[in-house]
Amino acid sequence: MYKSIFNKRTSILFKHFSNKQYALFSVLGKEVLIGTLSIATLSNAKAEGISVNASKADSTFLYHGKEVKLNEVLVTAARAPQASGQQTRMVTVLSREDLKAIPAQSVNDLLKYVVGIDVRQRGPIGAQTDVGLRGGNQEQVTLLLNGINICDPQTGHNTFDVPIDMNEIERIEILKGPSGRVYGTSSLFGAINIITKQAVNNSLHSFVKAGSYGFLSAGVGVHTLKGAVSNALSGSYTRSDGYSHDAKGHHNMDFEGGKAFYQGVYNTNELNVQWHAGISSKGFGSNYFYGPSDNQYEHTFKTFTAIQAETKTGKIHFKPAIYWNRNMDRYEWNRSTPVPVKFNYNRTDVYGLNLNSYFDWFAGRTALGAEIRNEDLVSGHMGELLSTPRHIHGTDRDYTHGLNRTNISFVAEHNLSWQAFNASFGFIATKNSWAEMNMRVYPGVDLSYRLTPESKLYASYSSSLRMPSVTELYYKYKGYEPNKHLKPEELSAFEIGYKYHSNAIQAEIALYHNHLTNMIDWVKRITPDNQFVWKSVNFGVINSMGVETGLHLNLQQLIPAQHFFKSFQVAYTYTHQKVENNKEIESRNVLEYLRHKASAILLMEPITNVSWSMMYRFSDRMGTFTNKEKQVTSYKPYGVLDTRLTYTQPRYTVFVEANNLLDKTYFDFGNVPQPGFWFMAGASFNINL
């Protein structure tokens, strides 16, 4: 996952919004020098120093008069670009090499090996997955596609239903901790950004793979490049029988879905414009996903479209973006049978418009931005009663309820640098039409100090808020009781850390403290008729503390006489949460967090063109659940071993892989067992046109 020869890599200067494979941070106007960090280091990439004003970046810089060799790549990671040596933000990067080495069939599988990320799956190959950061849940993380927020205000359960096949992903970037002034207020515990490939030539590529449990996946894509315009178009289909059956012997964890995605780019010296559109459609068995029924089913259909631009000349740089996301969901308590419980239909339309800018003056670099985002949901039962029902296409029913809310935010940030010291500080001011509140301001400040050419200390304070999802406000179904008077969650966080980075060794450690107020979750209550229900509430205050550590060894650098072992990486994270006024609450999400998480990855190259990866991850989850025998049960710790063997040629790649080699039985959610041993094999092909 790391480059084999670090000292031969040169730093590349990605001009802000140039036609390159960079990320969230380029879209947002942030800049940081990022090493190609392995996911298993579970650590963060930090900024190093290269002048942003240079037309090209050299692979060296001066530190107190000493020439220092760099082995990192320049991308963006602050509201306005600045000299990368002045940067203070931290980001974890899953590179294209990481994606190729990991035995994964979805973005969710990739994230399982990242420190501080909790991936809780309810079904195979990403059918339905909740992703949290540093003890947070699926509602408290922002997911972005090429820098555009694609979160679903209905529920975080469907957030990671993205229209991108794994083969079209260039990289994934992860920032942890609240940072409203960078990503907007929904990023309570952090943000994950998926960056897609852009066309660099005219080519045709395809893939096919198959495996256990009736798994089959195939896809095709085409890239074109002519002058300043490039286009990328792809589509894929995936299905599986699943790995369990209901009481009648029918499959109840099956999956079937398709994706299509298009991206275009126009890039000149004066202007860069990007646009994309995507579709995702899938249906999956939902055995015990949301309640005590082994025959549940869900279908989701999503569309995404956006246009982004940046001016490259003038004293003030402008970066506008406009987007529209539509999410449609049909939930069936009894599969294909709308009795005795009717199907639950929901449709959400999200419209967004933002404008960011930055300029230089004698005191540093200042960035200003504003965004307006409208969320409109119509539903068969969630929300307030509509004055005029809206027909549900393809059915004899109407949307009878709904909710519409608009969020307006303003951002200001300033960056300055003095010798080895760097600082970035600012705030976001936000107001939501749904919440009964005045405009609120959430500040943040990031500091860093370079101790030596290879090491740096950093510290940060950040804050943000999150509006309740529509599900938390209005979901009333079997065993669930909503609360439309929920208050927004608010989080403030402190973090300090240290990083050492040389050609052969990388080591990182981070300590953090989170203070969460008005925490929203579903807690178990007993009704007057002695029935258990899950009630959505604001309860108590959570104080959490944690540590993240990671070590990466480039074995080809440390032991140059051998060529079999490429690298070894190990990482560990620990989180402890304390809930004030906790009276033995059984929580649905928040209190079921990972106390311990560890992973290790060994990369090998047995012979030329053959790579072999062995990956192990350990998880120990806090919290309890009520099993099918009505007994309160604690989650048990578990370890999973995965492997992948790949043979690569310029025009094709062949692989075999296995997940859960030891066939462990484990749960991410109560009563929803995860698959045992799973074998897959496949091939991909690439033809230059």
Task: Locate the predicted segments by residue.
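Gram-negative outer-membrane beta-barrel transporters
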Residues: 417-422, 513-515, 535-624, 684
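Outer-membrane beta-barrel signature, preferentially recognizing the C-terminal barrel domain
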Residues: 291-313, 346-348, 436, 450, ...
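Extracytoplasmic beta-strand/coil segments of soluble accessory domains associated
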Residues: 108, 112-148, 152, 170
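Short, acidic, small-residue-rich periplasmic hinge/interaction motif at the N-terminus
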Residues: 49-100, 108, 138, 312
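Short strand-turn segments of transmembrane beta-barrel domains in outer membranes
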Residues: 191, 196-224, 235, 250-254
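Flexible loop and strand-edge segments within Gram-negative outer membrane beta-barrel domains
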Residues: 240-257, 271-350
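A beta-strand signature from Gram-negative outer-membrane beta-barrel systems
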Residues: 166-203, 554, 559
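Short acidic/polar hinge/loop motifs at secondary-structure boundaries
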Residues: 149-176
